[in-house]
C-alpha cells in the first residue's frame, strides 16, 4: 500500500497522480474517516487525562482518610467509556486499512502518462525478424504435429489448457531448466522451491487480494468444507517468493536478496473472455520462471534495469527477436511504480507479444507485508521489492515453435538448448 502520510499531508496531489492510472481516489471518504479517527483519539485522550486526574484525587482522599467511593465509581465509568472508544477506533482503523488496500501504487515520475497500451513507449528493438520462403504457420498448427494437444486437455479439464507429449514436452522442460540455470549461474539468483497454494495473507501482501480475487482459483479442501482459512492456487511465483520476507526484519548487509523459482501459475483470466482463445498464449495453467529481488530503497531502480537485462539475456541466448517497452500510467499493474514489458516477435501474428513483465513496486508490497530491513541507524525501514518473468515458459515455447519452424513441419532447436535435449537438434513431426 502507499504511505498513508502522503494522503494526510497532500491528498489532492496523490489524487492527481492516481488519476493518471484511471483510479479515482475518494477524497471525501478518506477525509471523513480521518476526521472520525481524530475525534475518537482526541476524546480518548481527554478521558485518559480525566482518569489520571481522578486517580490522583483518589490518592489524596485516601491520604486524608476520606471516602473515595464516588470518585472510584466515576473512574470505573471512564474505564467503560475508554473500552467503547477503543472498540470504535478499531472499527475506524479497519475501514481506513480497507480503504488503503484498495489504492494502487503511485507511478514513478519517469513513467509516461497514458490511458491504455497505446500510451506505452518503445525503448528498443533487438534482433531482426526472420524472413520465410514458405507459408508461416502458427504454433498451434506447428505444435499439433509435434505432440501439442488442446482437444485432449479440453476433455480432461476444459478450455484454455494443453497437453504436451514427447519431444515438445521435453523442449518445454528444457526451456525452464535453461532459464533457471542462467539466472542462478550468471545472474546471482538463489533457486527456490515454494508452495503452489498460498493463504490470503500472502496474496494481500503482494497485492492480488482483496481487489483481484476474481482472477484467482480458490482451493476447496476435500472433506473439510467450511474449516480453516481460504487457500488459493498461485497466479505467479512472485507471491510465495516475495512473501518469504513477510513479517521479517532483515539485516541491511543481507540486501539485495535475489530469488528465482519455476512454477505452474493458475489464473481464471476473468475479463479476458474472447481474447487469445486459440493456442497457448492465454491459459488457465502455464509455467513461468519468476525473478524476485528485495533491495535497499536507494537501489531499486538500478535493480529494475538489471532485472530487465536478465530477462533480455534469456531471449538473446535463444536468438528470439524482441522489443522492450515502458508501460504508461494507465497500463501498469496494480502494485507497480514502473514496469518494463518484453515482447517477443511471433511471425504468425506478425507482431510482438508480451513474454515478460518486470516491475518495481518500491515499498508498496513491503508495507502490506511488514517486510523491513535495519538501516544504517539500526532502525527498521521498508524494503523495496521487484518482480519479473524470466520468462513465461509456454510463451517462450510458442516463440521457438514459430520462429524456428521449417518448411517440412520440423522445428530446429536453439543451440543453447541442445545440452538440455540430449543433443537433439530438431523436433520432427510425429508419425
UniProtKB/Swiss-Prot annotation:
GO BP annotation list: selenocysteine biosynthetic process; seryl-tRNA aminoacylation
Species in which this protein is naturally found: Janthinobacterium sp. (strain Marseille) (Minibacterium massiliensis)
Family label: Belongs to the class-II aminoacyl-tRNA synthetase family. Type-1 seryl-tRNA synthetase subfamily.
Signal peptide: none
Protein name, entry field: Serine--tRNA ligase
UniProt GO MF annotations: ATP binding; serine-tRNA ligase activity
Pathway linked to the protein: Aminoacyl-tRNA biosynthesis; selenocysteinyl-tRNA(Sec) biosynthesis; L-seryl-tRNA(Sec) from L-serine and tRNA(Sec): step 1/1
Predominant cellular place of this UniProt entry's protein: cytoplasm
Binding residues for ATP: 267-269, 354-357
Pfam families for this protein: Seryl_tRNA_N, tRNA-synt_2b
Amino acid at each position: 500500500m502507499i504511505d498513508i502520510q502522503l494522503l494526510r499531508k497532500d491528498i489532492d496531489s496523490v489524487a492527481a497522480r492516481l488519476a493518471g492510472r484511471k483510479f479515482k481516489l475518494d477524497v471525501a471518504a478518506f477525509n471523513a474517516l480521518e476526521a472520525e479517527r481524530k475525534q475518537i483519539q482526541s476524546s480518548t485522550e481527554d478521558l485518559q487525562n480525566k482518569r489520571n486526574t481522578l486517580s490522583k484525587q483518589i490518592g489524596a482522599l485516601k491520604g486524608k482518610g476520606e471516602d473515595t467511593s464516588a470518585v472510584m465509581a466515576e473512574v470505573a465509568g471512564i474505564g467503560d467509556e475508554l473500552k467503547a472508544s477503543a472498540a470504535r477506533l478499531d472499527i475506524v482503523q479497519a475501514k481506513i486499512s480497507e480503504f488503503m488496500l484498495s489504492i494502487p501504487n503511485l507511478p514513478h515520475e519517469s513513467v509516461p502518462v497514458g490511458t491504455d497500451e497505446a500510451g506505452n513507449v518503445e525503448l528498443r528493438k533487438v534482433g531482426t525478424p526472420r524472413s520465410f520462403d514458405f507459408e508461416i504457420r502458427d504454433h498451434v498448427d506447428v505444435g499439433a504435429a509435434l505432440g501439442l494437444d488442446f482437444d485432449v486437455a479440453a476433455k480432461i479439464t476444459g478450455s484454455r489448457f494443453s497437453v504436451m507429449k514427447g519431444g515438445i514436452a521435453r523442449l518445454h522442460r528444457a526451456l525452464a531448466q535453461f532459464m533457471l540455470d542462467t539466472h542462478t549461474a550468471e545472474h546471482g539468483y538463489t533457486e527456490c522451491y515454494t508452495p503452489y497454494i498460498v493463504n490470503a495473507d500472502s496474496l494481500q501482501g503482494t497485492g492480488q487480494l482483496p481487489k483481484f480475487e476474481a482472477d484467482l482459483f480458490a482451493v476447496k479442501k476435500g472433506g473439510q468444507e467450511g474449516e480453516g482459512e481460504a487457500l488459493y492456487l498461485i497466479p505467479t511465483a512472485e507471491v510465495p517468493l516475495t512473501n518469504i520476507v513477510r513479517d521479517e526484519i532483515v539485516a541491511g548487509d543481507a540486501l539485495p536478496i535475489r530469488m528465482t523459482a519455476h512454477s505452474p501459475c493458475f489464473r481464471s483470466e476473468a475479463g479476458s473472455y474472447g481474447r487469445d482463445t486459440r493456442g497457448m498464449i492465454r491459459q488457465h495453467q502455464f509455467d513461468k520462471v519468476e525473478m524476485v529481488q528485495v533491495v535497499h530503497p536507494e537501489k531499486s531502480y538500478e535493480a529494475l534495469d538489471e532485472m530487465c537485462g536478465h530477462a533480455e539475456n534469456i531471449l538473446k541466448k535463444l536468438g528470439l527477436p524482441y522489443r522492450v517497452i515502458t508501460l504508461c500510467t494507465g497500463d501498469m499493474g496494480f502494485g507497480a511504480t514502473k514496469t518494463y514489458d518484453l515482447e517477443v516477435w511471433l511471425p504468425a501474428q506478425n507482431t510482438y507479444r508480451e513474454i515478460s513483465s518486470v516491475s518495481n513496486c518500491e515499498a508498496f508490497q513491503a508495507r502490506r507485508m511488514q517486510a523491513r530491513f535495519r538501516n544504517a541507524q539500526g532502525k527498521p525501514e521498508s524494503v523495496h521489492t521487484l518482480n519479473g518473468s524470466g520468462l513465461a515458459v509456454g510463451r517462450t515455447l510458442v516463440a521457438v515453435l514459430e520462429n524456428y519452424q521449417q518448411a517440412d513441419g520440423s522445428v530446429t532447436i536453439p543451440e543453447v538448448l541442445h545440452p538440455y535435449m540430449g543433443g537433439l537438434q530438431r523436433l520432427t513431426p510425429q508419425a
